[in-house]
Amino acid sequence: KDRTMNDLSAGSGVVKPTDFDTYHLAGNSPALFIATPILKRYDELKIAGDHWAQRPLEVWNPNMRRLYYIYGGFWKAKMVSPEGVADPLYESTNQSPIATSTSVDLQVDDYMFMRPTQSEFVMLQFGDLLAVSGNQIVDKWPVFHQTG
């Protein structure tokens, strides 16, 4: 049995990406999220190249009646806020489309939040971690950088 414990494995247990949602860490709360701004908002579903499917999808699924494009994407992460919003319709590293119901009323420059499935690799894609308490950024923490 592997009993290896190091600062990386302990750190992952502390920030708790979804891959660490285990019985042993049930008492820990997730502490690592990706915040991404909304770039575009459409009050109808717009699917590139599939305009014929737009209206039937909106009628069939009320969660496909509004469309947001978020910055970036293709991250190893799951959408967590706003609550009940699904992962992107398709993955893109540039802009990712997020379909929602009309009850989700966000605007351009608001943020959506994702919870990473892993920690070390995802952290390499961003700058410093921002420590937040309440609604205030209280500190910045550097992350390890990949070296070659």
Language model features by range: what are they?
Residues K1-G148:
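Active-site anion/phosphate-binding pocket segments in diverse small-molecule metabolic enzymes
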